[in-house]
A protein has these predicted regions:
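The feature marks the first
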Residues: 121-124, 178-179, 299-302
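Amphipathic alpha-helical coiled-coil/heptad-repeat segments
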Residues: 1-21, 142-199, 320-369
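Proline-centric
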Residues: 16-21, 96-106, 119-121, 134-153, ...
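Short clusters of hydrophobic/aromatic residues that line enzyme substrate/ligand-binding pockets
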Residues: 15, 82, 89, 119, ...
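Structural detector for helix-capping/boundary residues
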Residues: 13, 25, 54, 117, ...
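A short beta-sheet element
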Residues: 52-115, 124-127, 132-136, 229-293, ...
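Non-catalytic DNA-recognition/assembly elements of restriction-modification systems
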Residues: 8-37, 45-51, 146, 192-213, ...
Length: 369
């Protein structure tokens, strides 16, 4: 700090160099209270939302709280997660409630500042992760005058609205694609130029089904060829057992029945069933993936302790498949829909990056409004 040149209008503090008018303050001094919620009951027909560690978790016929508050998940895997509540509501006992002193601290500014702080770094406990009100009260933050807080919150709010709008667009595109899949893959909607009947086949007649060799977890690394298991990508390995992309179904564990499309040159473990159509020239692999992912394998899951799908029932699983040209045309339509969703997701991530960069500048006073 002694070797730093402090710009005009700034000052040195324990948190670094901040604008002269800003003050380093404890969250406890900026809040009227920080305490746990009290609700432990739900009412299916209640009118008041009950907030928990993941947002609204139910409803109640009565409410304990009223007005704006910031909520922080207190315990469990979501400890440190933020939410905002207003109106009349209730809060579960696994959630901390921060009531702000609105004459010195703007709620929207505070929410952004706590988001930027990343509260999950305060979480402790290996068995049951936890964050306490005392920890929150001791958080020190650089705080500008109230008018500047509101201006900063207003600017960040523009990005919030853009992010929310883009997220809604992605939801709409996903719903549209899902509806399109259901109609195209059931032949309820036929593309122009196609009218031939679809054939009913068994999965074992069009694909080779097998579970590859499983590798040990200690053999996985951070580099090499991707390895796909029961939960999708699980690591990397120095070799691959499939040169071309493959359609796979998770056949063990809680995600049993989940369909994935692996890339070429990857290792697929024995926790996944490969549906290999490489040697079937009458099947378009992209179409096959969409068809399988639109199918339900719930009725094939067996085992009470460890859910699993075994090969024999899968071999007999019935599908309806159109001629190859129609398969290709359908795959092209659905691939275009996927690409549209991917582009929308890329834009959403750009907006989020822009907001994070803006927060870094505005919430530290490096950039003034």
């Amino acid at each position: 700090m002694d070797n730093c040149v402090i710009p005009h209008g700034y000052k040195a503090t324990a948190l670094g160099i901040i604008p002269q008018e800003w003050e380093v303050m404890l969250l406890g001094n900026l809040s009227n209270s920080i305490s746990s919620g009290r609700n432990k009951h739900r009412d299916a027909h209640g009118q008041y939302p009950v907030f928990g560690s993941t947002g609204i978790i139910g409803y109640s016929s009565t409410y304990e709280y009223e007005g704006p508050v910031i909520l922080v998940a207190r315990v469990g895997a979501n400890a440190g997660t933020l939410n905002f509540a207003s109106g009349q509501y209730d809060v579960s006992d696994n959630t901390l409630i921060i009531t702000i002193k609105q004459n010195v601290y703007d709620y929207n500014f505070a929410y952004n500042q706590l988001t930027h702080y990343k509260l999950n770094k305060l979480v402790f406990g290996s068995g049951q992760p936890l964050i306490t009100s005392k920890q929150l009260k001791n958080i020190r933050s650089p705080v500008p005058p109230l008018a500047e807080q509101r201006k900063i919150a207003e600017v960040l709010g523009v990005w919030d609205k853009a992010i929310e709008k883009q997220a809604r667009l992605i939801e709409k595109l996903a719903l549209r694609k899902r509806a399109l899949m259901q109609r195209l893959l059931s032949a309820k909607l036929r593309l122009p130029g196609f009218s031939e009947p679809w054939k009913k086949v068994k999965l074992g007649d069009v694909a080779e089904l097998y579970q590859p060799q499983t590798i040990q977890s200690e053999d996985l690394s951070q580099t090499g060829y991707p390895v796909y298991g029961a939960n999708g990508l699980i690591g990397y390995y120095n070799n691959y057992n499939h040169e071309y992309p493959q359609v796979v179904i998770t056949c063990r564990g809680s995600s049993c029945g989940t369909v994935n499309f692996t890339p070429g040159k990857c290792w697929i473990t024995g926790n996944a069933m490969v549906l290999n159509v490489d040697n079937n020239r009458d099947v378009n692999k992209s179409f096959f993936y969409y068809l399988i992912s639109n199918s339900s394998f719930v009725n094939l899951i067996s085992g009470s302790g460890q859910p699993q799908i075994v090969r024999q029932p899968l071999l007999k699983f019935e599908l309806r498949i159109p001629p190859l040209k129609e398969q290709t045309a359908i795959a092209e339509v659905l691939t275009a829909a996927d690409r549209e969703i991917d582009l929308a997701k890329e834009k959403l991530e750009r907006l989020r990056r822009q907001k994070r960069g803006l927060m870094q500048q505005l919430l530290t006073g490096k950039k003034r409004i």
